[in-house]
A protein has these predicted regions:
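Extended catalytic cores of very large enzyme megasubunits
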Residues: 1-166
Length: 166
């Protein structure tokens, strides 16, 4: 009767040495270089075994924000998303499908405008990511401001650490 049918990756790996019970994995990336590269490695491993991947990148500080430990300004989210894009294209899912990655960012993030340009066909290719899917979390407050032609303020997450959890 097909009352339940698992996702394609689950079916693909059933009965193999690498079975998966989930076809998609969602993670949150923190504002820490070691964690960023751990997430890139995790994405590659999950993709290798047919998992689709989604990453929330909202916690990364915005472009120009100070990285106090080395006293330099951050280059923001976009260069890391370029790496995510490249990992996605290099790893094919079990040799059968290309990698699939979605990246998420809040509408108040300082880098949201550059983020929205990631998939454009024009501009600096070092700031483009054509092979990942972008998603933007849009709160009701944003839409209310749009309706009223109101102001919207952008922040770097290191300046408002609790905003993402509201």
């Amino acid at each position: 009767q097909f009352l339940y049918l698992p996702g394609t990756p689950t079916l693909l790996h059933a009965g193999t040495t690498r079975p998966q019970l989930s076809s998609c994995y969602i993670t949150t990336v923190t504002d820490d270089l070691a964690h960023i590269f751990k997430c890139l490695s995790d994405n590659a491993q999950l993709s290798k075994y047919s998992g689709g991947v989604g990453n929330d990148w909202t916690y990364l500080r915005g472009t120009g924000s100070l990285i106090k430990s080395i006293d330099v300004q951050s280059q923001g989210v976009v260069p890391f998303l370029k790496l995510v894009n490249d990992v996605t294209t290099v790893i094919n899912r079990s040799g059968k499908r290309r990698g699939a990655t979605a990246v998420y960012l809040e509408t108040w993030h300082l880098d949201v405008e550059d983020y929205l340009d990631l998939r454009r066909n024009t501009g600096d290719e070092r700031r483009r990511a054509h092979d990942i899917n972008t998603a933007n979390w849009i709160p009701d407050l944003f839409m209310q401001r749009v309706e009223r032609d109101g102001r919207w303020t952008l922040f770097s997450p290191d300046e408002v650490p609790d905003l993402h959890d509201l």
